[in-house]
Amino acid sequence: MENTQENPATPSAEDIGSEKQAAQGAAPAAEAADAALAEAQAKVAELQESFLRAKAETENVRRRAQDDVSKAHKFAIESFAEHLLPVLDSLEAAVSDTSGDIAKVREGVELTLRQLTSALEKGRVVAINPVGEKFDPHQHQAISMVPAEQEPNTVVTVLQKGYMIADRVLRPALVTVAQSK
C-alpha cells in the first residue's frame, strides 16, 4: 500500500514560496514598525525633556514669587519706619531740653504730634473720630448709652479715637451713644 498522503510536517514548494513571500513582505513592515517605534521613543524623550523644563521653570517662578513675598513682608515697614524717625528725633530733643520753659515744651509736643499724625497718614493709618455719626459696631465700641438730644444710636462723644489702616479697623473708637427716648 502506497502512502498517497503527503507528510504534513514536510512543507510543499507552494508553502515554502508563500512563506518566503510573507517573510519578504514582513521585512518592510517590521522595518516600518521599528522606524515608527524609534520615532515614538524620540517623541517621548522630547516630551519628557519639555515636561522637566516646564516643571523646573514653574518651580523657579514659584520660588521667585516666594522670595518676593518674603522681601515685601520683611521691608514693608521700612517706609513707615522712615516716616517715624523725625518723631523720634523730636521726642529725643524734648527729653534733652533742660530750659524748663513749659510753653516751649508744649509747642514741641504739638509739633511732634503733627509729625506723628503725618507719619501715620503716610502709612495709610487714619483716625476714627465719629462724633455725630450713626453708631457702627464695626468701627465703634460703645462704652455707655446716655440720654441726649441726638437721634438714637448716634455717637455723642468719643472717649478714645479709633484707627483704621486702608479699610481695616486697627482699633475701634471708644464712644458713648445716644439712648432711645
UniProtKB/Swiss-Prot annotation:
It is found in: Cytoplasm. Its main location: cytoplasm. Residues 1-10 have a biased composition (Polar residues). InterPro entries: GrpE, GrpE_coiled_coil, GrpE_head. Keywords: Chaperone, Cytoplasm, Stress response. GO terms for biological process: protein folding. One of its GO terms (molecular function) is protein homodimerization activity. GO terms for cellular component: cytosol. The keyword rRNA-binding does not apply. It holds the Pfam family GrpE. Residues 1-33 are annotated as: Disordered. Residues 21-33 have a biased composition (Low complexity). PANTHER family: GRPE PROTEIN, GRPE PROTEIN HOMOLOG, MITOCHONDRIAL. Belongs to the GrpE family. Homodimer. Participates actively in the response to hyperosmotic and heat shock by preventing the aggregation of stress-denatured proteins, in association with DnaK and GrpE. It is the nucleotide exchange factor for DnaK and may function as a thermosensor. Unfolded proteins bind initially to DnaJ; upon interaction with the DnaJ-bound protein, DnaK hydrolyzes its bound ATP, resulting in the formation of a stable complex. GrpE releases ADP from DnaK; ATP binding to DnaK triggers the release of the substrate protein, thus completing the reaction cycle. HAMAP family: GrpE. This is Protein GrpE. It comes from Burkholderia cenocepacia (strain ATCC BAA-245 / DSM 16553 / LMG 16656 / NCTC 13227 / J2315 / CF5610). The lineage of its organism: Bacteria, Pseudomonadati, Pseudomonadota, Betaproteobacteria, Burkholderiales. The gene is grpE.
